[in-house]
Swiss-Prot record:
This is FERM domain-containing protein 8. The gene is frmd8. Residues 31-382 form the FERM domain. It is found in: Cytoplasm, Cytosol; Cell membrane. Residues 1-23, 381-416, 451-471 are annotated as: Disordered.
Length: 471
């Protein structure tokens, strides 16, 4: 997100005041720095003036250490990550200074208890920028850059951040086998290699470890693992056969194939936020409660995912939603990100409101607005200066539109896929304007239906010392 360079927080805590004095002493002396990568390896740097070095300058040192060309400068960004919070740094951020303010950021953007905050320490990661268009990835020629992107995508698959169907994660696991173990092993050697590295190195944790339960206990985990190994070996053999030609078996081709497969997941490249939503009221007492969700935001749209069940609850392109965030009005209230979208209730078209409770609502709202701006700029550039649409933007026929609509509706009804939205399982506020018809928000819903309808899309800065891009 963008922001001004004002003081953050308005009233600095005693901890931050005691720490900031050490920043000046770090300006001249050489210091060791560990920058972690998605595969848990680290780049060890010894740098002078670390205290006043911004992320852009630090990026040059990391790219040099990794032999990454400067042409890939926009692909990656620095992130501060911990179990409590993830933040993407802007090029002008001072990582050393921001690290000293970490506890202040946790108090502002998380509900973590004081004890957890006092013990939390972020790691500095070098990984994909949320603002890098996925279409550009497959144009990258450098194998080192593609391998870094592969490592990060694989991590998100294994950790369940990118929900996908069994046939999808099995194919991705087979591609990982081909990339990491090679394509020349016979079935016996491949099975032995998979067992040595363990299934959890290739398949999502919830798939490799199983969900447990009575039937799982009767069957035995060993038998289930053997079956999964056989399926993985079979799929790997299929992948290797389809890549039988020499060039297709090269690592760079397999890396591209893995990333291309990940691009089929709409939430690839998202920044992720923690939040909660209301559960639908159930039972005689209409008790609901809340459900933990992960909110992914990218250049493409917003995706709300069930943390426990590893599936999508709601996926919306920016053209399909309006949004806003609200601050607590009284003690005990929550920060809320509001999402508005079209839906149906008992066959009647309605507007639906989804409330996402999160202290990161302000960050989410700002990131959505910034992504909308970036898309608007890129679409304007693609339209041409004379106002004529390019071939890719030519109007489509009504027949094409109808087919597209039918295909989209069919996909949404395929609820056995974890990728499809489950709007029926959400507890939303439904309304119809004047009780008769929906007042559709145009153009492209690029402004909030609460406060921005009369204004063109603009980006509202979040007032912090170091403006934050959130992930």
């Amino acid at each position: 997100m963008e922001g001004d360079d004002g003081d953050f927080p308005p009233e600095p805590s005693e901890h931050s005041l005691s720490q900031r004095g050490s920043v000046a002493s770090s300006v001249t002396r050489a210091q060791d720095l560990l920058v972690y990568l998605a595969n848990d390896s680290a780049v060890h740097l010894t740098l002078e003036g670390l205290g006043c070095m911004n992320a852009q300058e630090l990026g040059r040192s990391v790219r040099e250490a990794l032999n990454i060309p400067n042409s890939a400068a926009d692909v990656f960004a620095f992130w501060f990550c911990s179990p409590l919070l993830e933040l993407q740094l802007k090029p002008k951020h001072l990582p050393y200074k921001l690290c000293r303010q970490w506890q202040d950021l946790l108090y502002r953007f998380t509900e973590a208890p004081t004890e957890d905050i006092s013990l939390d320490e972020p790691s500095l990661l070098f990984k994909r920028s949320v603002f890098y268009p996925r279409a550009k990835e497959l144009q990258i020629e450098d194998e080192g850059v593609l391998r870094l992107l592969y490592d990060e995508a694989k991590m998100n698959i294994l950790e369940g951040r990118y929900p996908c169907d069994p046939e999808h994660w099995l194919t991705l696991g087979a591609l990982s086998c081909a990339i990491e173990l090679g394509t020349e092993l016979d079935d016996q050697a491949l099975t032995a290699a998979i067992r040595e590295k363990k299934l959890s190195s290739f398949l999502p944790a919830h798939a490799a470890l199983g969900g447990g339960g009575f039937l799982s206990t009767l069957r035995g985990r060993g038998g289930r693992n053997a079956e999964m190994e056989q399926n993985l070996v079979k799929e790997c053999r299929s992948v290797c056969s389809s890549a039988a030609s020499g060039s297709s078996q090269e690592p760079i081709a397999l890396l591209r194939q893995y990333l291309r497969s990940c691009h089929n997941l709409p939430y690839y490249g998202c920044a992720f936020f923690a939040g909660e939503i209301d559960k639908p009221a159930q039972g005689l007492l209409h008790r609901g409660g809340r459900k933990a969700v992960s909110v992914g935001i990218s250049l493409e749209g917003v995706y709300v995912m069930d943390v426990k069940e590893k599936h999508v609850l709601l996926g919306l392109k920016f053209t399909e939603l309006s949004w806003d965030h609200s601050y607590p009005e009284t003690e005990g209230d929550s920060h809320i990100l509001w999402l508005e979208f079209d839906g149906e209730e008992a066959g009647t078209p309605v507007n639906k409101l989804l409330k996402i409770y999160s202290k990161q609502a302000e960050l989410m709202s700002g990131l959505i607005e910034f992504c909308v701006e970036l898309r608007s700029v890129s679409e304007s550039a693609a339209t041409g200066t004379d106002g004529e649409v390019t071939p890719s933007h030519e109007p489509t026929s009504p027949e094409t539109n109808n087919k597209t609509r039918e295909r989209r509706q069919g996909k949404l009804r395929r609820q056995n896929s974890v990728v499809c939205s489950r709007v029926h399982s959400l507890s939303t506020i439904n309304y119809v304007d004047d009780g008769k018809e929906i007042k559709r928000l145009k153009p492209k819903r690029a402004a909030s239906f609460f406060t921005r309808q009369a204004q063109p899309p603009t980006y509202s800065a979040v007032q912090v010392t170091e403006s934050l891009e959130q992930g």
